[in-house]
Each structure stands twice: as C-alpha cells, then as structure tokens.
Amino acid sequence: MQLNVKLNAPKQSAEATALQSAADRVKSATETIDEAWQRIFAMKLTDAQRLTVLEAKKAMDSGKVGRIKTGKFSKEEALEIGRRVVAEKNERERKRRMEETVATKPDNYFVITKDSDLPRLVDRLMLEVEAQKSDAWFRKAFDLFNNTHIRKRLLQEGVEIPLVTSFTEWDTETSGTDTYIDLSGGYSFWLPLLNEGYYVAYGHLTDDEQCTRSNALEIVKSFIEDAQHIKAFHNTPFDLSMFLNDGMRPRGFRYDSMDAAQIMNEHEDSFGLKPLVTKYKKPIGASHLDDFTFEDLFGNGSPMIYSPEIVGIYAIKDVEKGWLYTKWQIDMMLKSDKLAVAYFEIRQYLYEVNTTIERTGFVIDTEELARLEIEFSEKLGAAIKALHDAYNIDDQFLYEMSLALKGDKIRDWITSQKKRIEKQAEMLSQCEEELKRSNPTTKKYEQLQERIRKYKTNKLAEPVPQNAPDYIHEINFDSDQHLQYLIYDVLKIEDKSKIIDKKKERLTNKDVLALYFKSEPSLKPLSDYSKLSTLLGTFVRKIPNALDKDGRLHTKLDTVSTGRYSSKGYLGKSNDVLFAEINDDNYLEAMRILVDAEKKTRKGTNLQNIPARTDEGTRVRMAFKPPINHTFIGSDLSSIEPRIQAHRMATEFNDDIFAEMYRKGLDPYVEFAAILFEIEREICTESYYKAMRGTPDEVPAYRKAMKQMFLAIGYGQAFDMFYKGVIPFGISEEQALVAYKKFDEILPGFKGMVEATFEHLRKYGWTATIFGQKRRFPGYVEKYKRLCQLMKRCGIESKNDPELGKKTNKLHRKDRSEFWDLMRFTGGCERAAFNHTIQGSGANILQLCMIRVYYQCVLGLGWEFALTLHDELKCAVPNGQLTGDAPRLFDSIMTDTYHLVLPLACDTVIEPCWMDEYSPSEWFAKQNENGGI
C-alpha cells in the first residue's frame, strides 16, 4: 500500500521562486528525447493525434526527420512533425497510385485531347445507340423508361415525352461543386455494348495538350439535349447543373444510381459510388477495377490541376463502375417487390424537375425588405422593452438569475478572488519591505518600484457576484438556459416538453415554444419578441445577401423520409468570381479563379420556415415576386392524406364510408365528429366554432378533435394518449371516451388498415407507399419480438393494455428498463411506418403533378416553376397566357393526373406576389374592372 502524503511547504520568497524556475529550465534542458516522447504520449491525446505523434516518432527514430523548433520538445511540435510526415507519405502514395493507374491503363479507355479526335468519338457513340436497339436487355430497360403512367397521361394532353432509344453512363470533372457557378473541365462516358469509355479534356490547368472547350461541348450538345438518349450519372442533379452552367439545355437526365441506391436501401453506410461499388463489387462484375477514390489519387484538390491522362483514366473507370452498378441496380429492382415501379414511375423524372425548381428561384423585392427591416426593428425594440416590463427584468432579476444558473461558479470565483486579493496584498507588503532594504541605485530597486506601482494601480475586482465572469449582466432571449429560467422558474409554466420529446425536460425549442405560445397568455410578450427576432435575423436581414449569380433567391430541395419536400439554404462561391461571358479566350483564366475560390458564401434560405400565419410573416413572403410580365399561379392538394386513407380503406379493406363522403362533397371530419361525439353536425363545423369562440355559447373544437382521433388511431395510441391530444380542444374525458370506443364500429376499415400496416412491419420490417416506395426500419422486427417476450412474461396482452404500466412491475428492474426502451423504439417505428404509407403516397402523387407541370407547363408553355412546398406547387405564368385556361390547367394537373377511388381536390389561386391570393373568379372579375393586368 502506497500513501501519497502532501505536506504544506513554507511559502517561498520571490528569489526562491526564481531559483526553482531556473532549476526547472535546467531539468528540461537535460531531458532526453526518449523521456520527451514518454511525456508526450502520457498527455491527453485523441486517437487521431496519437497516430500522428506515432508517425512523428517513427520518422525521427529512423533519422528521416529532425526537430523543427528549439527549446523544450512539445506536443504541438510532435503533432506538426507528424502532420508533415503523414502529408509527405500520402503524397508519395498518391504518386505511386497515379503511376500505377497510368501504367495499367486499359486498351478500351480513350482520353481525347485533340479536336481532330472528337468526330470519331461521336461516331462510336452513335454506333452504341444503334447496337442497343436490338439488344434484349436494353429493350427491357427502354420499356421501363417509356411505359409509365405519367407518359401516357401527358400523351392524353398532347404532350409527348420522346421514346427512349439509348442508355449510357456519364460524368463530369469540374472546377468545384457550386452548382450555379462552377464549370466543367472534362466529361466522360461509357458505351456498354462497345465496352469502351471516353474522357474529353478541355479545362485542365496544366501545360498538357487538350481540346478546345467550345468544340468539346458542341460535339456532344445535340446528344446531351436530346431527351430520347438517357444519360445516367451518380448524383445526376449535380452533373445536370454543370451542363446547364456550360450553356446547354440538357434533357434525358433520368437515371441516378445514387438516388436508386436510396430506393433500394436508404440505410447504406455511404452513398458514394466507390464505397457502393466496393461493397457490391462481385455481384456487379467489377472485380477487375481498383478501389481508388478521388482522394486516393488527388487528395482534396481539384482534378483540373492534374494532367488529362491521369484524370481521364480515373474518370473512365468511374463511368465503367457507374454503368456496372446501374445495370445491376435495375436487375435487382425488377426482382424486389415494386421497387422498379417506385423508381421508373416517378423518380426517373425528378432530377430534371427538381433542378428546374431550384434554379428558377424567386425575384426578391429588396427595397420592400429594407422597409420591413426598419419597421420590424422598431417593433423589436418595443417588444424587448415590453418583455422587460412584463417580467420585471431589472438588476434584482439578473442577480437572482445569475445565482440560480451560475451560483456555484460565482461562489467559487468569490472564494478564489478573496484569496487572490489577500495574495496581492501580501505580495505588495513583501515588495514594500524589500524596497526598504534595497539599494536605490540598483536595477532591482527599479523593478520593485514598478511592481509596487502595478499592484496599487491594477487592483483586483471586489469579490461580489456582479464582478464574477459568469455573472449575467443581460438576459439573452435566444439562450436556452435563460429561457428555461424565465419560463419554468419565474413564470412557473407547466413543463410539457414530453409532448414533443418523451426523453427531455424543460425544453425551449421552437416546437415546445409554439405549444406554450398557443396556451399560455403570460408568454405573449415572449411570443411577440420571438416572432420579430426570427423574421429579422433569419429572413429580412439575410435574404438580400443570400442571392445567387442571377440576382434571385434560390433554395436547395431535400426530401424527408416520407418523400415530402423541404428546403434549405446552401453554401456557394462568391458571385464576385463570375465572368460576364465565358469564351475560349478567357475560359482557362476563369477555371483557375473558380478552382481557387472557396465555397463559403451563405446563399438561399429555408422557405417553409417563413411564417405564413402571421401578418409580419405574410409581408415577408409578399416580397417574393414573379419576374416582370409574369404572375404567380399556385395550387395545393386539399386533404390529400385523409383521401389516401379513404382510398386504402376502400381498396384494401372494402370499407367505403370514408371515400363515399368525399364522393358526396362532404367534410368527413365534420360528419364523423357529429356521429362519434353525438352532437349536431352544424356545431362540429370550423365556422361555428370560430363564431362562438369567446362567447357564453363557446363549443369545443370538434372538427380538430376528430382530426386528432384519426392521427391517434393511425399511430396506435391508447385512449389516455388520445385524450391528452384533445384536451386543448375543450373535449371532456367522457366525450373523448365515447368517441374513442365508437370509432372502430363506425370505421372498421380504418383500424384494419392500421393493424395490417403494423402486421406487415412486424413481418418484413418495412412499409411502402401505394407506388411501392419503401421505408425500412432496421432492428424493428428483432426488437418487437423481444418486446413480445417481455409482455408475455408479465401478462400484457398488447401494447394498448390499459394495465400495461402496472403489469410491468412484475419484471426485474433491468428488464423493465429494457421494456420501456423497446416500447419507445417500436412505437416510433410504427408511427413512422403508418405515416409513410399515407404521407409518402401523398408525396408521390404530388411528384406526379410536378412532373406534369414540368413537361406540360415549363417545357410546353414556357412557364417558370418557382416552388414546391408541402402539398403546394407554384409557377410564374407569362401575363399573355393568364386566361381562364391557366387555372383550369392547374386544377387538372392537381386533380386529374392520378386517380384514386374518390375525387382529389385542390385550391388554386392567382398571386401578383406570394401570399397576395385571389381565387380565379376574383382575379378575372378584378381584371375586367381594371381593364386587364
């Protein structure tokens, strides 16, 4: 047994301290390099740092490198040596790989660097096209592209998507990844039947021979712009954007192996081409190809700074890999349930559609935003004052908040500060005593005088809370900690965080705040502040600086797990790097600037987060304008999700009651509310609820409660959870129980639909939309089986057993904890699984509408496709085409593109700017009064 005893050593004088420091320096100077390495390896190092230091030690031990600094050998120096060693090692390895790549170049790889070789390239391309026409596999693939519902529907409208006659794999090498500004410097393609690949170089920043850009692009322009020739890529939207940046009008960009990979398995570890090809190398027939990634050969740099030969070989290998993977994907999708249907009926068209929407963007009235900034800033100042007044935010408030949030740190600081003050006084006294004994003519005397002066002039702060570094001198309404104190500790708001996240408490995120703002009058001042602060900080001030090269505001579209669209901002290169015009004379200069430019400028915005239900949010949206001589026309699908529920009930479970209400033009939520809550139909309407609200005759929000019931049953919720959800609507527990018990009797097909969805999930671990688009839930099947074992052990009949909580007490503590973890996991999967079958199907139908808008309105009529958001589509129509036919066409697109067993409905409006809405009848009546647009 070893005792570590520390004795209180006497305090040292300044001279003793100096002597000790000198001794330490001598000791460090005599430290051997082995001792230094031992010291550094004993320090706190991440795994990556430890490997880097190890590389440094190996290199120094072998004599390959030496120290790069003088003085004591430090961790920082070791890391820097290691980084240099690793960088040099990687560079040597890259050069070796490059040499190997060039030395093993296949005979069927052709790198084109002469303009005179371009015609032969096109001849080979056309020969491939001819060969594919008589190939059985390609005829099968062409049928997948051609034989689709939307193509047939467009033919009924007189719009023809050209029949597919070829299918080849392509890729581009570029100056960067900005999809609006960067340019291509080379393109590659693979000819499957001829079994050969080509790379055309024209933008390399080396002294090597290469093609002229204009000739290289012109030679394939007609092929790139011909929709009958399908061009496949891995990340098609990116390469489509590059060809657009190069001045082309690409068509037939209808296969993306990256997107198809997500259709096949959205849980791949990586969706990069190299990891996927490496994973499926044997089944796709790519065993003869190496696994070098872009980084393996070129590091993090641009391919344009390397020779056309090495980049060309790499690029051709990419398209060969891409083709082998693409062909295998199609074969697999045809074998796997309805995956080919999900892909070819919808997804193949979306790359051109989505890219068109993103690149269209909005014209922004920046002058209006400037006016709003002034107005909203004044309102924000008033809102901040109102906050301080309403919540008595003064010095006493800040004092109490500081002690509540930072009390321990503040008290520790006070204790330490008192010691520091005592120490300073002691040092001052020592210096003054030593000064008395010193010779006034010595340097030491001057030094003591200077130290005394500093001690007297630089007095330490008084040890009171207000001087502590952690003291809060100003409340920050954007701080979670400050808001938690205000909401939960000062205002004593009941914590409803678990409604949003069952694992969390005292949340202050936007979802929880939205819940409180609706039900807590005391939070109105905070609500007013939050609304204005968000509008100003996120939109009004940022949007004018987030415009792209065309002066418009764009957004990046993303699809959530169900397939619905969301939008977000993105990083791009500065618009300052743009050339007014690109030609053969200035192209390489432009490429050099683009290659060197960083992609760090924030552009675009999240459109769906601009509030639509407040006056201020509406005014921000109204700054989004159509182009000159255009007017917006927009439409959204009405109640698409309950209509899909009704469709499934009728077609899968022979229950027509829901669908029949839509066929009769009734509001099912009102009708079912009247039946289930046993109340008069009129009282259940939203208009009656709003008319009576705030009066002695106020009634519960029966229609909203009915919508909540459909959600609750769809998510498999027990009564207690359903009741919690309808309490805010004024529904009594007795009313809720009556309605809940009657639901299955009135709508037996709905429960059957939910149970069938859950049973499918429990058997296969996935669910799908009505078009076969899957969503998989890894681990669900195994965890549900384990949950069933635990339920059986304690006599629980089902997850909705009313005595579930009580019965789990029969389990041991560890098993009980596991039980509730499994309940949460499986419950989340079940809700998402059912939601996918409904919301995902709605997203698929909207996508079909988008495809029709693209082909019929954008390509056919010259409209601009500005937006897809939730269930809404918006186009800018040339004013000359804004007749009664325009809204009728949009109505047809939304309701007559795909048919359910009940009618679809939409709400079409005409807008001179976003949110300034007129029904078609109102608009044309107004135009007649005013004599035109």
Regions found by a protein language model. Give the residues of each.
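Conserved "right-hand" nucleotidyltransferase catalytic core of DNA-directed polymerases
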Residues: 2-204, 268, 280, 288, ...
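Short active-site loop/helix that positions an aromatic residue
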Residues: 177-178, 237-248, 260-264, 483-492, ...
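Metal-dependent phosphoesterase core characteristic of DEDDh/y 3'-5' exonuclease domains
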Residues: 190-194, 236-301, 328
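Nucleic-acid-processing active sites and adjacent nucleic-acid-binding tracks
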Residues: 193-231, 362
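Short beta-strand
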Residues: 476-477, 864-869
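Helix N-cap motif at beta-to-alpha junctions
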Residues: 878-884
